[in-house]
């Protein structure tokens, strides 16, 4: 039996009919804050408001619903960093199917709990592997041994067709408002979302530039399509943007993206954190890191999109509140507002007061101070964190620190030491 490896607009139209009474038609909103900031019209497709707070329900339900009754009776499995799993268990509950969900050990607790919440007694969650790719290998082995049905999160034409319904829905909404998009920005993890969207847009909105956005620490599609012209596996990835941190994209999504995606943007994880905080404070939108990728990319395209009409897909809103401290920390470091030093501190009374008076600027703030006293020496080691009011103050701060201790270590520039702090 030949396995289908292409996706057509007909496939997406058929998926749209299957999903019509299952998924929520999420809003397409003109965002006034971003429109003013970038001097253009920025629309947001709010998939963070989907039933499982992610677009993944579309692909999961479509892929499961096309299984035969015999296949469904054997149960389903999936590997996911969170959102695809929620789509699968939501579907399993609706169709009363047995499901085993494999998730990386590093998955935020909030996403693990949400999977259990959306599922039922027929759903089992297995935490295994440090990355999605390790987790995937375990899931495939289990699926084969138990003769179940693996629901691929991206490298499956039915999953891709389901994600493509987002594009059909978006174009119908924009047509009713007489809106034509010049640019579309969407996140890339394994490539299912961008493959489905781009397939539909290239047929029904061919003048729209499709921009795929990846975290800089996991740009597997860019490395495969642009750099190597073949699917490659990244040896190491940054797992912070957990919903889009994939070391290897799908063979099917690679071919579709290669044909349809006009350009790729890699966004620093710190910039994503700044976007998350900005969206929350300015727009009251709770976006997860992968969900904020599309908006983060606008800064890279600010000269191109001026005066244009843009749409960003907010792909998910399953953010763990316990991560907010780390998100704020990464944002401050990226914006060059927080700086860490290792200093030799004189072991005598008044040394700290001298440091505060002589080194800190009038608006600087100490956010971390760890002191290791050494009884047999004249100085002790201090790790200190300083937050600035203006990142332009850094040059003068470093000059004053160097005067206080010429042998100091600036931790922000030391990748290994820096990684220990965040």
Swiss-Prot record:
Enzyme class per UniProt: lyase
This protein's encoding gene: ilvA
MF-aspect GO terms: L-serine ammonia-lyase activity; pyridoxal phosphate binding; threonine deaminase activity
Cofactor: pyridoxal 5'-phosphate
Sites where the protein binds pyridoxal 5'-phosphate: 83, 189-193, 315
Matching PANTHER family: THREONINE DEHYDRATASE, MITOCHONDRIAL, THREONINE DEHYDRATASE, MITOCHONDRIAL-RELATED
Protein name as annotated: L-threonine dehydratase biosynthetic IlvA
NCBIfam families xrefs: PRK08639.1, THD1
GO process annotations (BP): isoleucine biosynthetic process; L-serine catabolic process; threonine catabolic process; threonine metabolic process
EC numbers: 4.3.1.19
Substrates-to-products reaction catalysed: L-threonine = 2-oxobutanoate + NH4(+)
N6-(pyridoxal phosphate)lysine modifications at: 56
